[in-house]
């Protein structure tokens, strides 16, 4: 299974930090690619710098034709839209996990008001709670549940920086 995240919309300076966090969360918790629908060189370079230093093969892509991307993706996988209006994650996650054994997953998270077409194109509209909260939180919970916690402490290949879990102090290994 390959997991990709589609960041739908991005409002320049207003969303720069949160969009970066969406991408970093996607990378850290098991996604292989993030797709932005709007170009932002600052966010892209921040994410690529993290990949360069912390390792892995995470990809950053800009695709302005998001509807076409979703339709094409559906030929090989399922589309999951994270929204507070969706079905309860606890009820639907076993089905998603079962499907993920044979299909890739595209997770859609919005930055602004999500167009009605997203709800219609998605195979699943899933809520991580029914209260307002961050798309970063929703994505983190979804990916953690999807991978059942297995991605939290994985090693990233080609990492120049690694953290060694420690109860006391900071233990950082840097490649020389």
Q: Which functions belong to the PLM regions below?
A:
Residues 32-39:
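Short internal beta-strands
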Residues 167-176:
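Long, charged alpha-helical interface segments
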Residues 34, 79, 125-127:
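Short, well-ordered beta-strand core segments
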Residues 118-167:
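Structured adenosyl-cofactor binding patch, chiefly the S-adenosyl-L-methionine
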Residues 15-30:
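Histidine-anchored nucleotide/phosphate-binding helix
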Residues 44-114:
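S-adenosyl-L-methionine/SAH cofactor-binding core of RNA-modifying enzymes
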Residues 30, 75, 121-122:
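Short, structured coil segments at secondary-structure junctions
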């Amino acid at each position: 299974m390959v997991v990709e995240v589609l960041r739908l919309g991005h409002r320049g300076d207003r969303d720069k930090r949160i969009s970066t966090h969406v991408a970093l969360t996607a990378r850290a918790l098991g996604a292989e690619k993030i797709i932005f629908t709007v170009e932002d060189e600052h966010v892209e370079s921040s994410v690529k710098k993290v990949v360069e230093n912390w390792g892995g093969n995470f990809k950053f892509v800009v695709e302005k034709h998001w509807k076409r991307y979703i339709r094409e993706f559906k030929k090989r996988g399922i589309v999951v839209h994270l929204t507070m209006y969706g079905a309860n994650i606890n009820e639907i996650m076993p089905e998603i996990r079962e499907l993920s054994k044979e299909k890739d997953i595209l997770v859609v998270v919005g930055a602004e008001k999500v167009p009605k077409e997203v709800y219609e194109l998605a195979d699943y509209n899933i809520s991580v709670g029914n209260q307002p909260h961050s798309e970063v939180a929703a994505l983190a919970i979804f990916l953690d549940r999807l991978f059942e916690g297995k991605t939290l402490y994985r090693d990233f290949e080609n990492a120049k920086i690694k953290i060694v879990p420690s109860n006391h102090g900071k233990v950082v290994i840097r490649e020389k």
